[in-house]
């Protein structure tokens, strides 16, 4: 059986504030009983937070079947990460200017540069010569680049209001990435 995940990412978070932001978001989720306060072995590879008694309040479909799964928690990421869908093959990397697919272009160097925080994370479109950071190109399926993210394992579909509430707590727009491992 595979595990599904929903990654909620702030692409505009300052790298220097990610730990404090993580604590602020955790406090918000714990106070509303969306997650439990105690860290447990409920995510893939790292400790996470199990669903709290009020987790159904943020889900579109009122279903707690995932509670029986070993992997069913929240993972908080506070380091530079590319959030992607895992199981789906990358179909396209589109220029934000002309929408031309750049997947055949050598973009892995730009990705490595972004990870290493160098200034050479640029891709130049082979169609219109538009040049920008790899983070500005449009990925299919959707990818997000950030220093702060929440990964909910096997929770299902969230209510839009939950995303709106998180944007207020985080202080930036968020990007949502759905995936499967």
Which residues does each predicted region cover?
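Short, non-ligating residues that shape and space the ligands of small metal-coordination modules
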Residues: 102-105, 134-135
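Domain-exit/linker segments immediately C-terminal to small folded modules
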Residues: 126-181
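Short cysteine-rich clusters marking metal-coordination/redox-active sites
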Residues: 95-98, 125-128
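His-enriched metal-coordination microenvironments in redox/metal-binding proteins
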Residues: 1-8, 114-117, 142-146
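N-terminal alpha-helical interaction blocks
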Residues: 1-88
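Residues immediately within or flanking Cys/His clusters that coordinate Zn2+
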Residues: 90-92, 122-125
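Short linker/helix segments within small regulatory modules
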Residues: 108-124, 140-141
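Acyl-donor (CoA/ACP) binding surface of acyl/acetyltransferases
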Residues: 92, 100, 115
């Amino acid at each position: 059986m595979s595990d599904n995940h929903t990654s909620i990412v702030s692409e505009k978070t300052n790298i220097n504030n990610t730990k404090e932001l993580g604590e602020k978001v955790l406090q918000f989720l714990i106070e509303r009983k969306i997650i439990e306060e105690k860290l447990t072995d409920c995510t893939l590879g790292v400790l996470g937070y199990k669903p709290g008694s009020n987790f159904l309040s943020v889900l579109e479909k009122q279903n707690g079947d995932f509670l029986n799964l070993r992997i069913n928690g929240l993972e908080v990421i506070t380091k530079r990460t590319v959030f992607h869908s895992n199981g789906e093959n990358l179909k396209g990397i589109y220029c934000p200017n002309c929408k031309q697919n750049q997947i055949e272009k050598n973009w892995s160097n730009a990705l490595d540069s972004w990870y290493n925080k160098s200034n050479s994370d640029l891709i130049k479109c082979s169609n219109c010569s538009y040049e920008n950071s790899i983070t500005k190109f449009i990925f299919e399926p959707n990818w997000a680049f950030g220093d702060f993210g929440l990964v909910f394992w096997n929770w299902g579909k969230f209510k839009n209001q939950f995303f709106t509430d998180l944007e207020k707590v985080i202080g930036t727009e968020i990007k949502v990435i759905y995936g499967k491992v």
